[in-house]
Every structure is written in structure tokens, then in C-alpha cells.
Amino acid sequence: MERTLTILKPDCVRKQLIGAVIDKIERAGFRVVAMKKTKLTTETAGAFYAVHRERPFFGELVEFMSSGPCVPMILEKENAVEDFRKLIGATDPAEAEEGTVRKLYADSKGENIVHGSDSEENAQIESSFFFSTEEAVRVNN
């Protein structure tokens, strides 16, 4: 069973879409292994997105991700990383396929509702950023 990390971003929380997005995730066959509501500081957002430090959008991304509460979650499913990326759609909601999370709920490329890990390796790294081993308990059945 593969795992991936998602973050329901501050715009998702602000628009009161947490339940709708989690419903879509669960209906797609994902199991929520761990979940918490938290607020990132600019420092923690910067550390999480450090891979983008040299990109022109880094400052705006950090500012946005620290603008309000977010909901990181570890999800589990066969082929979790790839399937979740398909479920959420393209980064830019204008380019996302119909029915995807971003097409349904996102306003812009910058405020696009949800983060999803882009590889199994990054999913493990990102999951450990938010959750301890004890919090990321194995789901049975």
C-alpha cells in the first residue's frame, strides 16, 4: 500500500471546503491515515517548500501557506501518489480536467486548494515533516 501527503491549503480552509474535499478523496478510494489542522509560520512554510527557494513564486507561496490554517493529511491507497495527482488536477485550475479538485474549487494557480506529493520519496519526506511515526499509524482493513 502506497502513501502520499496532501495539504488542504489555507484557501480550502477559508472557503469551508475541508469536508467536500475529504469526501472526494475518500470516494476515490483513499484512506486517511493521519490528519491535523495547523497553522504554518513563514519559517515552517519556507522550510517545507525549500525546494522552491530559488523560484520566482517562492515568497508568495510562503506568504500564502502561512496566511491561515491548513490541514496536512497522509493518505493511503495502491498507486497513491499518481492517483492523487490525477484526482487534484493540474496546478493551474484553468488547465485542470473537469471533475478534479482544483477545477471544482480552486481560484488560481497560486491559491489552488491542495498540495499533493509528486513522488513516493517526497511523500515520505513531506509526511515526516508534519507527522511523527506514532501519528502515521498503519491502517488495518
Curated annotation (Swiss-Prot):
Top-level taxon in the UniProt lineage? Bacteria
Can you say where in the cell this protein is located?
Cytoplasm
Reaction catalysed by this chain? a 2'-deoxyribonucleoside 5'-diphosphate + ATP = a 2'-deoxyribonucleoside 5'-triphosphate + ADP; a ribonucleoside 5'-diphosphate + ATP = a ribonucleoside 5'-triphosphate + ADP
Q: Which cofactor does it need?
A: Mg(2+)
| Pfam families in the cross-refs | NDK
Record's keyword terms, sorted: ATP-binding, Cytoplasm, Kinase, Magnesium, Metal-binding, Nucleotide metabolism, Nucleotide-binding, Phosphoprotein, Transferase
A single GO cellular-component term on record = cytoplasm
Any GO molecular function: nucleoside diphosphate kinase activity
Primary localization: cytoplasm
- What Gene3D superfamilies does the database record attribute to this sequence? Nucleoside diphosphate kinase-like domain (3.30.70.141)
Q: What is its EC number?
A: 2.7.4.6
Residues the record lists as binding ATP? 9, 57, 85, 91, 102, 112
InterPro entries the UniProt entry points to: NDK-like_dom, NDK-like_dom_sf, Nucleoside_diP_kinase, Nucleoside_diP_kinase_AS
Family statement: Belongs to the NDK family.
Q: What does this protein do?
A: Major role in the synthesis of nucleoside triphosphates other than ATP. The ATP gamma phosphate is transferred to the NDP beta phosphate via a ping-pong mechanism, using a phosphorylated active-site intermediate.
Q: How does it assemble?
A: Homotetramer.
Q: What is this protein called?
A: Nucleoside diphosphate kinase
